Design a protein with these regions (language model features):
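Hydrophobic beta-strand residues in large extracellular and virion-surface proteins
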Residues: 30, 80, 106-108, 149
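Short, acidic/charged, Gly/Pro-enriched secondary-structure junctions
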Residues: 94-119
Length: 164
């Protein structure tokens, strides 16, 4: 049997509400500079976060150990999925980026570029795609190009036009 009273539960509920609504994973867009049209074809992308690279174990006398943080992590990677069009929008993007040195800049929006709470700047991005699978028996799925997006993130935050 629970030991919580309704007053305790209401206190936790009210405290959680004061923190604000939870972010909805789908309420975000990735805008690639020079290829803004791909924002409507971007199904999945990594959301940047600031944190340390890991831990440093610090040994001490008599087997004592402690931890301290490594440097901040600025080189990130994560999954990127782009939905291809019959006109080859993703293939054109990949060819354009490859011809221009393979790197691009991007912005990740909490919202859309027109209406957002805030946005993060992603620097010197490059995409390592996997070859998409095409299957004659699969008439129920769009063609997706998946792979890994590598990028640098320094915590550059852009103020949005939606007041929280």
């Amino acid at each position: 049997m629970s030991v919580q009273t309704t007053a305790v539960l209401m206190g936790h509920y009210n405290a959680a509400r004061l923190l604000g609504d939870k972010s909805v994973s789908s309420d975000a867009m990735l805008l690639i500079d020079g290829h803004e049209e791909l924002s409507l074809l971007t199904k999945q992308f990594p959301w940047p976060v600031i944190g340390v690279m890991g831990e440093i174990e610090v040994p001490g006398p008599m087997g004592l150990q402690s931890w301290q943080p490594q440097a901040l992590k600025t080189a990130h990677q994560g999954p990127l999925t782009l939905s291809e069009t019959v006109s080859g929008s993703v293939a054109k993007f990949l060819a354009d980026v490859a011809a221009g040195g393979a790197k691009f800049q991007a912005t990740a929006y909490e919202g859309t570029p027109e209406a957002f709470h805030y946005a993060w700047k992603l620097r010197d991005c490059f995409f390592v795609p996997e070859a998409p699978d095409r299957d004659w028996e699969n008439r129920s799925q769009v063609t997706n190009v998946t792979g890994t997006l590598f990028f640098h993130f320094f915590g550059e935050k852009v103020a949005g036009n939606i007041v929280l």
